Amino acid sequence: MAGGAHRADRATGEERKEGGGRWRAPHSPSPPGPRGCPVPLKAAAQSLCRKPTWGRYCTLLLFQRKLEIYSVELHAATDIKKKEGRDGKKDNDLELKRNQQKEELKKELDLDDHKLSNKELETKYGTDIIRGLSSTRAAELLAQNGPNALTPPKQTPEIIKFLKQMVGGFSILLWVGAVLCWIAFGIQYVSNPSASLDRVYLGTVLAVVVILTGIFAYYQEAKSTNIMASFCKMIPQQAVVIRDSEKKVIPAEQLVVGDIVEIKGGDQIPADIRLLSAQGCKVDNSSLTGESEPQSRSSGFTHENPLETKNITFYSTTCLEGTATGMVINTGDRTIIGRIASLASGVGNEKTPIAIEIEHFVHIVAGVAVSVGILFFIIAVCMKYHVLDAIIFLIAIIVANVPEGLLATVTVALSLTAKRVAKKNCLVKNLEAVETLGSTSIICSDKTGTLTQNRMTVAHLWFDNQIFVADTSEDNLNQGFDQSSGTWTSLSKIIALCNRAEFKPGEESVPIMKRVVVGDASETALLKFSEVILGDVMEIRKRNHKVVEIPFNSTNKFQLSIHQTEDPNDKRFLLVMKGAPERILEKCSTIMINGKEQPLDKSMAQAFHTAYMELGGLGERVLGFCHFYLPADEFPETYSFDSESMNFPTSNLCFVGLLSMIDPPRSTVPDAVTKCRSAGIKVIMVTGDHPITAKAIAKSVGIISANSETVEDIAKRCNIAVEQVNKRDAKAAVVTGMELKDMSPEQLDELLANYPEIVFARTSPQQKLIIVEGCQRQDAVVAVTGDGVNDSPALKKADIGVAMGITGSDAAKNAADMILLDDNFSSIVTGVEEGRLIFDNLKKTIAYTLTKNIAELCPFLIYIILGLPLPIGTITLLFIDLGTDIIPSIALAYEKAESDIMNRKPRHKKKDRLVNQQLAVYSYLHIGLMQALGAFLVYFTVYAQQGFRPTSLFHLRIAWDSDHLNDLEDNYGQEWTSYQRQYLEWTGYTAFFVGIMVQQIADLIIRKTRKNSIFKQGLFRNKVIWVGIASQIIVALLLSYGLGSITALNFTMLKAQYWFVAVPHAILIWVYDEMRKLFIRLYPGSWWDKNMYY
C-alpha cells in the first residue's frame, strides 16, 4: 500500500516543473536515440576475458527514472599494463590504442527478459516452468558458467606486502649503506685480519633499524582490503529450486540460469530472477539503490526499463513479505550486484594525500642525502682519502641526512590520532585516512541513513482543513498538534487499525522508536506514531476485532479493513481505508471537519488538493485516510464479508485527513553542515531518491541554504521560463541522474565549479563515480559517505570513504577508509578537525626532526674538508634519530590546535605541502645551523679541556687516526697514545651528542606552535611533551653512564659540566623563534610572514 502511495506522489511530483529545482546544462544533447547494437552479456564478458591486460572495471547504470534507458551499461576503464615505448610517438600510439580499446568495450547489454512471455523464456533458457531444469542440464550449465558466486580479486601475498615495507621509503638507502659497510669490512679484512669491527657494527645496526621499522610499519598498516568478501557474505546459503519436477533445497551457489526458484518473506534473493508469479511480494532494495521504501513485485511487465519493471528481482536484495516463483536469468558475476562488486574492486586504491606528502618528503630528503653523499665521496677521493674510507663517509652523510625514525613516528602519530577519533565514534581502517579527512574540501554524502535517520517518520497531518507539524526527532515524544478535535480521534483510530505492522514479541521494555517491527517502512512509521500518542496499539486492535481485510496492491492503490467496534452499544462495523490520496478522495462523498461530517464540495476538494500539493512539494510521502460506519440493518453481526467479491460499500465514504511521512534528517546534521561550510568544505548530496525529496532534505539540513535558489526557483519567482534565467544568478542546483548522463565532463566541471550548493538525485553507482572523479578534477580532496552496496564503488574511488557502522552494508564498510560507529554525519566534523590537527602536528614533527640533520651532517663535512678528529660517529647519530628523538616526536602528536583550525580553508593538496620551502629553510638554515654551532661549542670545549685548542685540531686528522703514532703532543706538550686519542674521540662523540640533545629540548618546545606564542599556547597543556623531554635526558644519561663501557657504541662517561655548555644556545633558539612568531603576528601578509611561516 505505502509503495503505491509513494508512486502516486512521485508521479504528481514529476509533473510539477518547479518541484525538482533541476539544473539543465547549457547545450545539453537531446535524449539518446535507439540503443546501439546489443550484445549478449556472455559475449561482453568474453570480450573482457579476451583482453587479459585489462582489469575489469564494470560499471552499472542503475535505476534511471526515464523511459530512454533500457539497458545496463558495461564499461572498461582501468589501465592497460603494457611495456611502454621508448619514444614519445610510441607512447602516443599506445595511449591511442588504449582509448580505442576502451571505446570497443563500451557495449550495452540487452536485457529483455522482462518483456518475454513465459513460453519465450522457456525457449530462451531451455527450461520448463512447471518441471524446471533436469539435473543433468543444470550440471552442464554449472560447469559451463561457473558457480553462482562472486569471483574474489587476486590478493597481494603477505610476504610481498612485508618486503615492500622492507625496501620502501628511506629503507633502500639504509640497506645499500649496510651492504657497503659489510663489503668494505670484507675488503679490509682480506688485507688485515685484525681490522676493526666498527664497519660490521655499523652495517648490522643499519640492517636492524630497517628490519624493526619495517616490521612496525607492516604491523601498523596491515588491513583487510578484500571487497569481494563482503559481497560473498551477502549471498544466501540455500535456495529452493524445482528440478526434475521436484522441489529441492540446494546451496545458492549451485543455481544456474534457467532454474525455477521459490522465494518467500525473509529470504535474500539468490540470483537475478524474472518473476513468473507473485503473491503480495515486496522487496527491500535499499542496500542496492539507497531507497528505503519497499518495492512491490509482480509477474507483469510494467516498465520498459528492466531495472524499473516489477517482474525482476535482484541478487542479494531481501524479500520482505509475500511469496514468489521465478526463473534465474543471471548468476554470480553476471548479476547486477556482481557488476557493482567488480566495479568496487576495479577501482584502484588511490594514494591518500598524506601518502603523497610523505612520498614527496622522502624524495626530497633522499635526493639531498644521496647528492651530498656522492659529492663529498668525490671530494674525499680527490683529497687522497682511501676509497673504503670515502665509502664510509658516503654512508655517514646519508645516515646524517635520513631521519630513520621519522616514518615510524608518523605512523605512531597517525595511530594515536586514530585511537583518539575512535573514542569519538570514528573507526579508522586506514591510518592515513585521518589526515585525508582533515584535508577534505568536498564531501559527497548519501542521503538515506547518512543525513537522514533511515526510517520513515510521520512529518505532517492535514485534518480540519489545517496542516499540523508532527515531531520528527529521534524519540517522537513532543507531538504538539491539536489532539482534542473529534476529527483527530477518528483519524488516529484509522491509523491504528488500518495497519498490518506489528511489534516483534518481547520488545515491550525497549523505547518505542527503537522497537523492531515486522512490516514495511511506512506501516512501521504509522505504528510507532500511533503507539507514542495512543498507547498500546495491539490492545486497541484487540478491542476492535478485524473481520476482513484487503491488503494494498498496485491496482487498487488502497488498503481496507473492516472491524467490530469496541463500543458495546454500537453494533455497527467500522470500515477503514488508507492509500493514494487522490484514490481515497474519489471514494468519498463527505469530509469530516471538527468531528462532524459535511458534504465534500468543490471548495473542500480544492483545499484537499492544495494541502496535497504542498506536502508533496516538500518531498514527503502522502497518504489519505477515510472511514465509514456500515449500517447495522444491512450488515448485522452475522454478516459474512467476502474480500474477493467485496460485498460491502467502497464509495460514498467519509474523508478524514491526510498524513505525510519522510525519512527525516538527523538532528545533529544541520549543525555539522554549518561547521563544514565555515571550514570551507562543500557538502554535496548524492542520492538515488527523488529530486523533490532530495531537495527538501537538502534545504532542511542546510546543504541548500535558506536564501539560495535554483534556476527553477528563480523562474517560478519571476514568472518566466527556465530558459530565460541567467544560470549565474542561481547558487544551488538539483541535478537528476538522467541530466547527468547527458552531460559532458566539461559540463560537469562547469557545474561543480559554478554552484556552491549541489544536489544529485536519481543517481546510479556509475554516476556516483563520475561525480567523485569530477570533483577530483577540480583538485579537490573528496570524501564520500554512504551505507549501501550501491555506495561502495564511490567509497573506494574517493580520497576517503566514510561508511556507516550501524546501518552500513559489509561492502560499504570494507570499501571505506573510515567507519562512523554512531552513523552520525556530525562525527565527520570531529574527524575533519582531528585530521587538520594531525597535519599541523606532522609539520611540527618533521620540522623538529629535520632541524638536527644539519648538526649531524656538519661534523662529517668538517672532518673531510678541514681534517678535524671526527666530532660524532655514525652509530651515535642513530641513537639520536632512534633513541632520544622518537618519544618527543610522538609527543607533538598530542599538541592541541593553536588556533581555530575549523575556520581555515582546506589545504590545497598541490600547493600546501607538508614539507614546503619555508619549513626546510627555517629548519636547516636557521635553527639547524644554530644547533650545529652549539654542538661544536661542546665538542671544542671537551678537546680544549684535555689540551687541544680548536685551532690545533684543524688538519690533525691524518696524525690523529694513525694507529702507529703513540706520542702525539697536545698544546700543553702532553703525549697521547692511539688508544687515548680514540677514547677522547669517543668522549667528543658523547659531548656532541649531548649538545644536540640539549638543543633539541628547546627545539621541541618551540615546535609546539607555528604562529602563536608558547606562553599563549601554554607550556604545560601538553604533558606528553615533558615526558618526551624526560625521555631525552634519561636516554642520554643511560648511554653515557650506563652503556659507556660498551666499545661498539662509542660512548663514554661525560663530566657533568659538559652537559650545560649548550644551554645558552638552547635559550637563544627559544628567543629567536619567539621573535619570529611575534613578527608573523604583527605583520600578516608581509615578506616576513610569507617566508618565515612554515
Curated annotation (Swiss-Prot):
UniProt keyword terms in alphabetical order: ATP-binding, Cell membrane, Hydrogen ion transport, Ion transport, Magnesium, Membrane, Metal-binding, Nucleotide-binding, Phosphoprotein, Potassium, Potassium transport, Sodium, Sodium transport, Translocase, Transmembrane, Transmembrane helix, Transport
Entry keyword annotation includes Endoplasmic reticulum: no
InterPro entries reported for this sequence: ATPase_P-typ_cation-transptr_C, ATPase_P-typ_cation-transptr_N, ATPase_P-typ_cyto_dom_N, ATPase_P-typ_P_site, ATPase_P-typ_TM_dom_sf, ATPase_P-typ_transduc_dom_A_sf, Cation_transp_ATPase_P-type, HAD-like_sf
One of the record's GO molecular function terms: P-type potassium:proton transporter activity
Transmembrane residue ranges: 158-178, 202-222, 359-378, 391-408, 843-862, 873-893, 914-936, 989-1008, 1023-1041, 1057-1077
Compositional bias ranges of the Basic and acidic residues kind: 1-21
Binding-site positions, Mg(2+): D787, D791
Main location: membrane
Catalysis performed (reactions): K(+)(out) + ATP + H2O + H(+)(in) = K(+)(in) + ADP + phosphate + 2 H(+)(out); K(+)(out) + Na(+)(in) + ATP + H2O = K(+)(in) + Na(+)(out) + ADP + phosphate + H(+)
Residue ranges annotated as Cytoplasmic topological domain: 56-157, 223-358, 409-842, 894-913, 1009-1022, 1078-1094
Enzyme class: translocase
Active-site residues per Swiss-Prot or TrEMBL entry: D446
Pfam families, per database record: Cation_ATPase (PF13246), Cation_ATPase_C (PF00689), Cation_ATPase_N (PF00690), E1-E2_ATPase (PF00122), Hydrolase (PF00702)
GO CC, any one term: apical plasma membrane
Organism domain of life: Eukaryota
Tissue expression profile of the protein: Found in the skin, kidney, distal colon and brain. In the kidney it is found in the connecting tubule, cortical collecting duct and outer medullary collecting duct while in the brain it is specific to choroid plexus and cortex.
Job description of the protein: The catalytic subunit of a H(+)/K(+) ATPase and/or Na(+)/K(+) ATPase pump which transports K(+) ions in exchange for Na(+) and/or H(+) ions across the apical membrane of epithelial cells. Uses ATP as an energy source to pump K(+) ions into the cell while transporting Na(+) and/or H(+) ions to the extracellular compartment. Involved in the maintenance of electrolyte homeostasis through K(+) ion absorption in kidney and colon. In the airway epithelium, may play a primary role in mucus acidification regulating its viscosity and clearance.
Family note: Belongs to the cation transport ATPase (P-type) (TC 3.A.3) family. Type IIC subfamily.
PANTHER family listed in its UniProt record: POTASSIUM-TRANSPORTING ATPASE ALPHA CHAIN 2 (PTHR43294:SF1), SODIUM/POTASSIUM-TRANSPORTING ATPASE SUBUNIT ALPHA (PTHR43294)
Subunit composition and interactions: The X(+)/K(+) ATPase pump is composed of a catalytic alpha subunit and an auxiliary non-catalytic beta subunit. The alpha subunit pairs with the beta subunit of gastric H(+)/K(+) ATPase ATP4B or the beta subunit of Na(+)/K(+) ATPases ATP1B1 and ATP1B3; this interaction is required for the formation of a functionally active pump and its targeting at the plasma membrane.
Name under which the protein is recorded: Potassium-transporting ATPase alpha chain 2
Lineage: Eukaryota, Metazoa, Chordata, Craniata, Vertebrata
Gene name for this UniProt entry: ATP12A
